[in-house]
Design a protein with these regions (language model features):
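Blade/loop signatures of beta-propeller domains
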Residues: 19-32, 131
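Beta-strand-rich domains and repeat architectures in extracellular enzymes and scaffolds
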Residues: 22, 33-65
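A flexible loop/linker signature enriched in serine peptidases of the S9 family
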Residues: 39-42, 59-68, 84-88, 104-132, ...
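Residue-level detector of Asp-centered blade-edge/turn motifs that repeat once per structural unit
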Residues: 50-51, 96-97, 160-161, 204-205, ...
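Hydrophobic beta-strand positions that form the internal "hydrophobic ladder"
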Residues: 55-56, 101, 165, 209, ...
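Blade-loop segments of beta-propeller domains
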Residues: 67-105
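Short loop/turn segments that connect beta-strands within beta-propeller blades
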Residues: 73-77, 137-141, 181-185, 245-249, ...
Length: 346
């Protein structure tokens, strides 16, 4: 019996090892012990709780018509939907203490899923004007709005000190970054350049902000941007990574890759930025995005993942030991995006 038990354990370990090995792509020296946490559907933007024990993410799965918000343990267990199942949701985050969560939703405008954007004008992102930011208990109950202004309010994240939320809004006619207290008060505009600024995160000390920006310069580019925004659309073909102080001062362009670079996040020491980009793709028209890292001064660009499809939305755990990201690797079918977690190796 002991011998059979040994054989069973050996085979089980071999299967787990084979699964882990199948998730690793040659050249990914910073990632170890990669584990797949979701299996099937579209799962992305997974972010750690402040204690590093849970993840909150958006998912279109099962019979859902569009994304809803879920939480789970960092081993993939105990998956629970915490949004109300109405409208479309995006960009969720835990508040400090883990008892509250925030996310953006369109449900107060319409309870049905909003239509997908019109791709006849090329690849575009929809800027749904019904998006507002809500706070709820971590079990999804007691939903309350944090924003109520006309137009798009979304892409909210929370400072590590737990005091501030940064988000993107078109309340003043353009897509700019704003900060506010976690109760929705003391709203402050941080960016003022025409174009899109969004996807922002605070540095570990809460003193800096990293974000993606796309700023048209020629008259033709500005006209096209404004025309599309009037239709609640943007073209996400070129984003650069930027940083600024938490009060909006000292804006600095970090990347100059002329590519779609987004989802930036500071390393635990605050000296580098990990982000997603199609800069390394041989054909940037295809969905080949990888994780990359760069120093905050724009030097030392390093490729982190080498998967030939999509790797994106990276976030370090609060202790800096793990990295969570979304990827098309090991997809059961075309279009599946899943959440993965890995040990981070310097």
């Amino acid at each position: 019996m002991k011998y059979l038990s040994f054989i069973f354990i050996f085979v089980l370990c071999a299967v787990v090892s084979a699964q882990n090995n199948s998730l690793v792509v040659e050249g990914e020296k910073h990632l170890k012990n990669i584990r797949q946490l979701t299996f099937g559907g579209e799962n992305a933007e997974a972010y750690f709780s402040f204690d590093g024990k849970k993840l909150i993410f958006q998912s279109k799965r099962d019979q859902l018509g569009c994304d809803q918000i879920f939480t789970m343990n960092i081993d993939g267990s105990n998956v629970k939907m915490v949004s109300n199942g109405e409208g479309r949701t995006t960009c969720s985050y835990f508040l400090k203490g883990g008892k509250k969560v925030i996310y953006a939703s369109t449900f107060m405008g319409k309870k049905e899923c909003p239509p997908n954007p019109d791709f006849s004008q090329g690849y575009v992102w929809a800027i749904y004007p019904d998006y507002d930011i809500y706070v709820a208990d971590s079990n999804g109950k007691n939903i309350k709005p944090l924003t109520t202004t006309k137009g798009y309010d979304a892409e909210a994240t929370v400072s590590p000190d737990g005091k501030k939320i940064i988000f993107t809004s078109e309340r003043d006619g353009d897509l700019e970054l704003y900060s506010m207290d976690t109760n929705g008060k003391n709203v402050r505009r941080l960016t003022n350049e025409i174009g899109y600024d969004g996807g922002a995160f605070f540095s570990p000390d809460s003193k800096q902000i990293v974000y993606r920006g796309s700023h048209p310069t020629t008259n033709a580019e500005i006209k096209r941007y404004k025309d599309l925004l009037a239709q609640h659309l943007i073209v996400p073909t070129t984003f650069e990574v930027w940083t600024m102080n938490a009060d909006g001062s000292n804006k600095r362009q970090v990347t100059k890759l002329n590519a779609a670079s987004f989802a930036p996040f500071f390393t635990p020491d605050g000296k580098r930025i990990i982000f997603c980009t199609n800069y390394f793709a041989t054909d940037q028209r295809k969905r080949n995005f990888d994780l990359a890292m760069i120093n905050v001064d724009g030097t030392g660009l390093e490729r982190i993942t080498f998967n030939e499809t999509f790797d994106g939305f990276p976030m370090f755990s609060p202790d800096g030991k793990k990295l969570v990201f979304a990827s098309n690797r090991n997809a059961a079918k075309t279009g599946d995006t899943n959440v993965f977690i890995a040990d981070w190796v310097e």
